[in-house]
From Swiss-Prot:
Its main location: mitochondrion. Pfam families: GatC (PF02686). Subunit of the heterotrimeric GatCAB amidotransferase (AdT) complex, composed of A, B and C subunits. This is Glutamyl-tRNA(Gln) amidotransferase subunit C, mitochondrial. GO terms for cellular component: glutamyl-tRNA(Gln) amidotransferase complex; mitochondrion. One of its GO terms (biological process) is glutaminyl-tRNAGln biosynthesis via transamidation. The lineage of its organism: Eukaryota, Metazoa, Ecdysozoa, Arthropoda, Hexapoda. Allows the formation of correctly charged Gln-tRNA(Gln) through the transamidation of misacylated Glu-tRNA(Gln) in the mitochondria. The reaction takes place in the presence of glutamine and ATP through an activated gamma-phospho-Glu-tRNA(Gln). GO terms for molecular function: ATP binding; glutaminyl-tRNA synthase (glutamine-hydrolyzing) activity. It is found in: Mitochondrion. Belongs to the GatC family. It comes from the Eukaryota.
Length: 166
């Protein structure tokens, strides 16, 4: 299968298009695909554009110091820099603009790919002893467990941290 795809990366497309060798290689590579692609092959027509709604003038939300400290403690992310605060304000502003989009009469999706036929793999029964295989995915293990970074330790306030300019 890899050899069939290598031809696409090593040759110029103009040299391949229309040649019988290209068609044979493409058909061979296509026949080697085991699962159907999840990417839609045709774009879906939109009923209305949401871009004008999303391009309204920005109104940056006012975020007080207490809220920033709470978010830092919950997310373990340092938001003391002006760049981080600006990104946070932009994200909140974008989310508030999304809330204004009219969704009346729009059926909810179960998945973004619900118009595509998704092939399932074969259901293979095994003995279930996959612990060593699963633990190989972990960066750090202790005995027979995954080791995750602690999520409940709050960030310490640094002496040299700059206050946020409002």
């Amino acid at each position: 299968m890899i050899r069939g795809w290598t031809i696409f990366t090593l040759c110029k497309p103009s040299a391949l298009v229309g040649s019988s060798h290209f068609n044979k290689q493409f058909n061979w590579a296509k026949s080697q695909l085991q699962f159907a692609t999840k990417v839609p092959q045709q774009p879906y027509a939109k009923t209305e554009s949401i871009l004008p709604t999303l391009q309204e003038p920005d109104t940056k939300p006012a975020i007080d110091r207490h809220t920033v400290q709470l978010l830092e403690r919950l997310s373990l992310v340092d938001l003391e820099t002006n760049d981080a605060l600006e990104t946070l304000e932009d994200s909140i502003g974008f989310a508030s603009r999304i809330l204004t989009i009219g969704t009346e009469g729009v059926e909810p999706l179960y998945t973004v790919l619900e118009r595509e036929r998704l092939s399932l793999r074969e259901d293979v029964v095994n003995d279930g002893d996959l612990q060593t295989d699963v633990l190989r995915n972990a960066a750090v293990t202790e005995e027979e467990y995954f080791v995750a970074p602690p999520g409940n330790i709050p960030l310490e306030l640094q002496e040299n941290s700059r206050p946020i300019a409002h």
